[in-house]
């Protein structure tokens, strides 16, 4: 599972998922999976999609993960009254804005890449689209 090795602070404020995305172009591979909406991707969802893609391409080609879960999400235990401080860190998320490239792939045909990204998209809570590298 992806998570930071060390952080400056253990817990963070909830905040809001606003603004525009960075990393909107396919830069490493030839094909990419781009988010259309905004969401919070958990480390488990990122890993599940990666596994689906890896199995679909049968370990050929190369896959890049362009997102990293760097925000800790806390939860209080069940049946605990409100107050008494912030809960414990339960999982890590990456905040996704529209236009962000989530995964990239190279070394496979477009047909295989489309199939692999379709399997990966089914594991993600955000609507996505298939993009290719634009050469200028």
Curated annotation (Swiss-Prot):
CDD domains hit by this protein: Ribosomal_L16_L10e
Keywords: Ribonucleoprotein, Ribosomal protein, RNA-binding, rRNA-binding, tRNA-binding
One Gene Ontology term of the molecular function aspect: tRNA binding
Single GO cellular component term: cytosolic large ribosomal subunit
Any Pfam family hit: Ribosomal_L16
Superkingdom of source: Bacteria
Membrane-crossing residue ranges in chain numbering: none
Claim: rRNA-binding is one of the keywords in the record: yes
One Gene Ontology biological process: translation
Quaternary structure and partners: Part of the 50S ribosomal subunit.
NCBIfam families the UniProt entry points to: rplP_bact
Protein family according to the UniProt entry: Belongs to the universal ribosomal protein uL16 family.
Role according to the record: Binds 23S rRNA and is also seen to make contacts with the A and possibly P site tRNAs.
Name the UniProt record assigns to this protein: Large ribosomal subunit protein uL16
Taxonomic source organism: Actinobacillus pleuropneumoniae serotype 5b (strain L20)
């Amino acid at each position: 599972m992806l998570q930071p090795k060390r952080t400056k602070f253990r817990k963070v404020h909830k905040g809001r998922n606003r603004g525009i995305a960075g990393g909107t172009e396919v830069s490493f591979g030839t094909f990419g999976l781009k988010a259309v909406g905004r969401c919070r991707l958990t480390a488990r969802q990122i890993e599940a999609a990666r596994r689906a893609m890896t199995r679909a391409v049968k370990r050929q080609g190369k896959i890049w993960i362009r997102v990293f879960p760097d925000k800790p999400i806390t939860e209080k235990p069940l049946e605990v009254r409100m107050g008494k401080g912030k809960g414990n860190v339960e999982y890590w998320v990456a905040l996704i804005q529209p236009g962000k490239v989530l995964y990239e792939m190279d070394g496979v045909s477009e047909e295989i890449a489309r199939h692999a990204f379709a399997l990966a998209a089914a594991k993600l809570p955000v609507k996505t689209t298939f993009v290719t590298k634009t050469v200028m």
